[in-house]
Amino acid sequence: PKLKYSRDSYSSPQMIMTIQAPDEASFEEFVNKNKQVIVDFFTKAEMNRQINLLKKEYSSVIAAKVGSMFGCDLRIPAGFERYKQGKDFLWTSQDRPGSEVSLNFVVYSYPYTDKNTFTRDYFIHKRDSVMKLNIPGSLEGQYMATDSNYVNVKEFSVKGEYAFEARGLWYMENDMMGGPFVSHARVDRPNGRVVVVEAFVYAPKDKKRD
């Protein structure tokens, strides 16, 4: 079997992957062996598409706020204007009209001490403490927490610096709300801190993608 791809053959932006195999059995075997490569290919293509879109149109309000608070350049889709600010914490959200869907971005930071700062357990502990303080529910005793049974982490590097990704599920303590989240944490060595950017969704009736 052979795998090849082409860019912008019939439209733009567009990525096409073609797999050639002599028969169905060898095709199935090839896909099973290379499924992660295939998924990563389209995931990266979609990420690049979103990045190019955000270069043209983004929330200038949130970009300016993140820049002043954290010294970071963060661009999120236009339409995110309202926000809640705390100590080393910023939360912006957008509710979809006519639905229960709520899209959210959070940025927060905390001191970088050593490599243990990036362990799975430490991340969950730190996330829970930050969210409990800054994202309470509508009633007393309600606050956001992490479902520790469903947190997957991945280490990688950005421009030679250590970075950490966590994907999992959040829930509202003493409430029925919950949904998926994705967090990216990076070391900011000049300022001796870790900066976390997170997206989380509340969409009880809709399917969620990566």
Model-derived features with residue positions:
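Secretory pathway targeting signatures of secreted, lumenal, and periplasmic proteins
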Residues: 77-136, 171
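Extracytoplasmic
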Residues: 12, 67-69, 75-77, 161, ...
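Short, well-ordered beta-strand elements
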Residues: 14-26, 105-109, 192-202
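Solvent-exposed alpha-helical segments and adjacent loops
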Residues: 1-60
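N-terminal "mature-domain start" segment
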Residues: 55-84
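A short, polar/proline- and glycine-enriched secondary-structure boundary/capping micro-motif
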Residues: 101-104, 177, 206-209
